[in-house]
Structure formats: C-alpha cells, structure tokens
C-alpha cells in the first residue's frame, strides 16, 4: 500500500513538473485588415496633397521595434510626407524598418524625403566636398555669365541629390537654420540660399524635369 501511494504521488508531481510554463503572447487586439480598395483610395487621396493642407512629419528612432511608436507601421495613414530624420534604414542592419518604410510608401502612398540642416561652414563641412575656407570666402554668390554655378553650390547640391536618385525616395527636406556668424557671412545664407535652391530646382521640384520629386524648404532665419 505504501509503495502504491508513493507511486501515485510521484505521478502527480511529475505531472506538475511537466506543465508548459513558457509565456505565450495573447493577440487580444488583432490589427484591423483594410481592403485593397481602401489602400487604392488612400493613394489617390495622397496624390492630391498639392491641392490641400497636408500632414508632414519628421520621424526618427526607428531602429527600435518593441513599440509601434518607433515603427513606420505605427504612423497614421493620414501622413502625406515623412521626413527621414533617422536616416535611410539599412536593409541588412534594420530590415524591419526598411520593409515597413517601403510598405508605407508603396501601399499607403506616404512620400519619403531626406532631411538635412543646410550648414556648409559648420564643423568645416565644406571640406567634405573638397573645398577650403578660402573657397567659401571668395566664391561668388551668383551664376557667372556662362550660366555656371559656383563650386560650393554644385558639389553640395549634387551630394544631397545623390540620396534621391540612389534610394529612389521622393525628394529633399532642406532645414534652413543658419546659426553661426561664419554661416551667415560665408555659408549658405540669404542670396546664397536662394542660389542653392535655384540650382537644386533644375533637377527636382515643380519647375524641374522631375516635378514629382519634392524640394521642401523649412526652418528659420
């Protein structure tokens, strides 16, 4: 009888230890699935953004995936233009952000632009384009009689345009925020900023051969 009782107790305890204690996620609120007609209508609406008030966002920190607040999939469908303040996501290092970004672009029609703060003098940024401080001090702020733009304008402009062509995104977001005295005196400020936008406008923007590519300027003086 004692042996039988011990055998029963052993079986009971073995049953408890064999229970699956791994935590399992519960899908308490499944994501709502919209129809293809919904997305087609959404893209058609996004195409009218030049005719109405629009929704523009700067977005960064999308190297995180634990919260929808840090993911492209978490952005509202109503966003017309997303400025990639966190940079262009690497498809190898950050495949989720890359995938969701392009799903947002292609499925929802949300346009993607690359932002940059326009400061060529700050931290000797001009040196990245093979220019010297003397170049910035002495080069003209206007087009020469032959229609040639100054070197700083061409080199910096082409550097920014490269992202548009290489990544296949929708344009540039230029943040005009000249802060240092050097930037205001020798950098891209005032008439030089006007010239810079004019140069870029030959390639992207409403007066260019690529009017679907956006040339956005925001900031302060």
Segments the model singles out, each with a brief description of its role:
Residues 6-7:
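Gram-negative bacterial Sec-dependent N-terminal signal peptides
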Residues 49-221:
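Chitinase-like catalytic core of GlcNAc-active glycosidases
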Residues 2-3, 218:
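Intrinsically disordered, low-complexity Ser/Thr/Pro-rich tracts
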Residues 1-2, 11-49:
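Bacterial Sec-dependent N-terminal signal peptides
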